[in-house]
Regions:
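Short cysteine-rich clusters marking metal-coordination/redox-active sites
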Residues: 37, 51
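Short Cys/His-rich micro-motifs in 6-15 aa windows
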Residues: 55-65
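Histidine-centered copper-binding motifs that mark active-site loops
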Residues: 69-70, 75-77, 81-88, 96-97, ...
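Outer-membrane beta-barrel initiation region
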Residues: 292-294, 682-744, 776, 780, ...
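Outer-membrane beta-barrel proteins
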Residues: 699, 724, 729-731, 753-760, ...
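Transmembrane beta-strand segments that form the barrel wall of outer-membrane beta-barrel proteins
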Residues: 708-718, 731-742, 750-752, 764-774, ...
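Membrane-embedded beta-strands of outer-membrane beta-barrel proteins
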Residues: 723, 752-754, 800-802, 824-826, ...
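Outer-membrane beta-barrel "beta-signal"
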Residues: 851-856, 869-881
């Protein structure tokens, strides 16, 4: 009874105390909800309205108790240990630490946790340094920086995205890899456990960190060996949306990528979803690259982008097709690879159903695709862009935007009703889409983008391309994506039908700054005429309800980004490439053919780039942000990836404030592997302890774009076998072609050449080789067209000569053998009569000739027939590799 009485007294006292506390609460604490700005959370109001700083609509938020605002809620995977100056957080394996994050990919095989193995590098201490655009905040709440540990287990796995089981690379059993979340001020401690039988690495894309942890094999570190562990440790001095991916071989294409979220100390209380977009191919990525290098057009067939002569005639573009080949160009395309699937957080269709009407959601979008650009649209409202490449930008509303490989965007979207709205990502080539659905209820689909009219793009490129392969500069301002020349191919664009209706703008009304000289139906520039193209829609204003497309000219930093005064170093790069042999370069030099570019700490480095190729390139600089010089002057946006379109000239600048070696390269994976990049090296940098032998490291780093890859074809027909085997690198090639008759009188022939390609377009190929002809039945000599005696049946001679690609893609060859005999030959292969039917022709001064047809059944098998002056008529199969 005594204990019961004591308990009743204590309960009564507690209730009285709580009641007194509630009665003395400030009025603001009793307020149940307030209105805040998503970009400026310090702006608070008791009524709806607009933000006085940026003009954005204030968002209703429930007011939390002060105690809850002072400390972030504990996370399940986090165990705190007290420390004098910092809180240490340990996580046994990486899990998405952000609310409403993506689930692990259900098709990837799970990975069992294993104890950490000894690391390959010692723990180091690094001091955070101030970076432009990432100034420390004045926090409204106390925050103790933590050391946050993640353990990443990299394993080979099996996935099924398409109905076929394929090999992939997963981190912690997930594709994409788990999102890693930190708060600005933390220290990242990431243990990478390589459980594969091959080497690996991880690059922390866009992150400012000690050079030795940048994650580029043989440039900043040794590769992580099989069945070993490597520690990446660096301070988090930024905030925003970033990502991480392998920088080893083709592992990025195979699934080794994930989101990296750096929260502000005072991150706005708004639901945020990391979205990792990616492209998936069932083919081995090494085979994809080999196919691109061998000029196999199977990917074009899959995408319906071969633009054969029959299609050109049917659609009224026969003259356009002829002019295209006269200028030695192949079919028009906007992408290199035909992908089976495009994925949103590892799914072709993802859902987040817990949102309701009025909710504003922040989408942290990462393009983790190896080579795919995505158009982003949303069915519920306009899209508000608030961040790019981890940096805040002043909010800008658009109807759509294109995101390049490796770019990140922070986007705000709102659900207007209690329905399900589609955030749609469409591949630039319009071959397929992937979606994220927000909310629940009736599905409100985003409008699909129509198929591209490639012949209109071909017509445009014909007018812009010189006969020598250069793109002729135009008499108009082309920079910062403000003039998308590809819009002539868009069915939703007025440029296709040359009308003035339904066009799209790339800037709001105040941004109409294109300088164009237009006449009635012709745009003239530097002796170069753009006939048949209405360029007006490329710079339409945002008035009259027209749709607005984002470009870099519209991005403005919220604070000044000007560099501190200092010596300036100006560099100029011409982006060059050759789709026929798939060699991509800067100034016609690959990484291995170029010296490192020396820069000094304290310099301001300005880079002026002109894209003199037919493809767009997302150029990425490791370890730095650069200013993209646009009309906003002191408020130029900060980025780490710049998408540069064909014919564009763009200028960027950055403060040289680091040490060590930093990679600058095109972020289309296959372009980078081909050699499109440079290395910036800080003078007087201390030695990298992870690379004790710099010469060996340089040799290993340069191997990538020098690799020799095989290709060839084997014909088995009724009259015999003919074929060719080629082993080629970016510059050198050795090839052997043969003809073996099934009858004795047909004999055996083979010609072997070794040579080097020269020039930006690689049309010139000097060679040496050996010619072997043998016939046991016939041994006759006759005069060739030069009046020289030629034994076509029995000869064994060394040869030297040169090949040159003529207009119409005709391969000409002049050679001389060790007996002084000359031979001139013309050959054209794979004339695209239809999407799958190819014509082959050959003739030379030895009075040899050939004509044949090949119908492509699969990537590796064709039906074929041909007539040969020596072996006569035959039909059968041709196997292509």
């Amino acid at each position: 009874m005594y204990k019961l009485l004591i308990l009743m007294i204590l309960l009564g006292t507690g209730q009285y105390t709580l009641a007194q506390h509630e009665n003395h609460k400030p009025a603001q604490q009793q307020q149940s909800e307030i209105y805040t700005c998503p970009m400026h959370p310090e702006v608070q109001s008791t009524r709806p309205g607009k933000c006085p700083k940026c003009g954005m609509t204030l968002v209703k938020q429930k007011l939390k108790a002060p105690a809850k605002q002072q400390q972030a809620p504990p996370k399940k995977a986090v165990k705190a240990k007290p420390a004098p100056t910092k809180q240490r957080v340990q996580q046994k394996s990486a899990q998405p630490a952000q609310k409403k994050d993506q689930p692990a990919h259900k098709h990837a095989q799970p990975t069992k946790k294993k104890p950490a193995t000894p690391v390959q590098n010692p723990e180091v201490k690094e001091k955070p340094v101030h970076k432009a655009g990432h100034k420390p905040e004045s926090p409204r709440q106390a925050y103790k920086p933590r050391t946050v540990r993640y353990d990443l287990y990299v394993r080979d796995t099996l996935v099924n995205f398409t109905g076929r089981t394929r090999r992939a690379v997963a981190i912690n059993g997930s594709i994409p890899a788990p999102a890693l979340t930190f708060t600005q001020g933390d220290t990242a401690e990431i243990y990478v456990h390589n459980e594969m039988d091959v080497e690996t690495s991880i690059h922390w894309h866009g992150v400012f960190l000690p050079n030795r942890f940048d994650g580029v094999p043989w440039l900043t570190q040794k590769p992580i060996k099989p069945h070993s562990t490597y520690l990446y440790k660096f301070p988090i001095i930024q905030n925003g949306t970033y990502w991480y991916h392998s920088h080893s071989a083709f592992q990025e294409q195979s699934g080794m990528y994930g989101a990296l979220i750096f929260n502000k100390v005072n991150e706005p209380d708004m639901p945020a979803i990391p979205i990792v977009l990616s492209d998936w191919t069932d083919r081995n990525p090494k085979e994809v690259y080999r196919s691109l290098r061998s000029a196999n057009d199977w990917f074009s067939i899959q995408k319906g982008a071969t633009q054969g002569y029959a299609e050109a005639i049917r659609k009224g573009y026969f003259g356009t097709k002829l002019k295209n080949e006269w200028k030695r160009m192949t079919a028009m395309d906007v992408s290199d690879v035909a992908y089976e699937k495009f994925l949103t957080n590892g799914q072709d269709i993802a859902e987040q159903t817990h949102f309701t009407a009025g909710d504003t959601v922040k989408l942290r979008v990462v393009n983790g695709g190896a080579s795919t650009y995505f158009w982003l649209t949303y069915s519920g409202s306009k899209i508000t862009v608030v961040g790019n490449d981890g940096n805040d930008v002043e909010p800008v509303e658009v109807d759509r935007l294109i995101i390049a490989p490796a770019e990140t965007y922070d986007l705000l979207v709102t659900l207007p009703e209690n329905m399900q709205y589609e955030f749609l990502a469409t591949a630039e080539d319009r071959s397929n889409t992937t979606s994220l659905w927000l909310g629940r209820g009736m599905k409100m689909k985003a409008k699909r983008l129509g198929k591209l009219n490639y012949f209109e793009g071909m017509k445009m490129m014909n007018d812009m391309m010189k006969l020598n392969g250069d793109i002729e500069p135009m008499d108009m301002e082309m920079s910062n994506q403000k003039m998308d020349m590809n819009s002539v191919m868009y069915p939703e664009s007025s440029a296709q039908d040359h009308s003035m209706h339904g066009g799209e703008t790339t800037e709001p009304a105040a941004d109409t700054t294109m300088h164009m000289k237009q006449k009635a139906d012709t745009t003239s520039h530097q002796g170069h005429t753009m006939q048949g193209h209405d360029m007006h829609n490329m710079n339409r204003s945002g008035s009259n309800g027209e749709k607005v497309t984002l470009n870099y000219g519209m991005l403005r930093a919220p604070e000044k980004t000007t560099l501190k005064p200092g010596p300036e170093k100006v560099l100029r790069f011409e982006l060059t490439g050759n789709m026929n042999r798939y060699v991509w370069t800067l100034d016609n030099k690959t990484v291995s053919e170029s010296d490192k570019i020396l820069i000094k700490k304290g310099e301001n480095v300005k880079i002026i780039m002109f894209n003199n190729s037919m493809m767009r390139h997302p150029m990425h600089l490791h370890g730095h942000d650069f200013r993209v010089l646009n009309k906003h002057g002191e408020y130029a946006p900060l980025k780490n990836v710049l998408d540069i379109l064909p014919m564009e000239t763009d200028t960027i600048e950055f403060a040289a404030s680091e040490s060590g070696d930093w990679f600058f390269h095109c972020h289309i994976l296959y372009h980078m592997i081909a050699g499109m990049g440079r290395v910036f090296t800080y003078q007087n940098s201390p030695p990298n302890p992870d690379l004790p032998d710099p010469k060996l490291a340089q040799k290993m780093f340069n191997r990538e774009d020098k690799i020799f890859l095989p290709s060839g074809q084997l014909g088995l027909e009724s009259n015999g076998s003919d074929g060719e085997f080629v082993l080629g690198s970016s510059r050198y090639q050795i090839s052997t072609e043969w003809r073996v008759g099934f009858k004795k009188e047909y004999g055996i022939e083979s010609e072997t050449y070794f040579g080097r390609y020269f020039g930006k377009m690689q049309w010139l190929f000097p060679f040496v080789g050996f010619d072997y002809h043998y016939n046991s039945v016939e041994d006759e000599a006759e005069e060739n067209m030069f009046g020289q005696l030629s034994n076509q049946n029995n000869r064994k001679v060394a040869v030297a000569g040169v090949q040159y690609t003529l207009p119409m893609l005709i391969l000409s060859e002049m050679r001389v053998d060790t007996k002084g005999k000359l031979r001139f030959q013309l050959r054209r292969e794979d004339v695209p009569l239809t999407s799958r039917l190819r014509l082959n022709l050959m003739g030379n001064t030895d009075k040899e000739y050939m004509a044949g047809l090949r119908y492509i059944v699969t990537k590796y098998v064709s039906l074929s027939t041909h007539y040969d002056s020596d072996m006569k008529y035959g039909a059968g199969l041709t196997f292509v590799y």
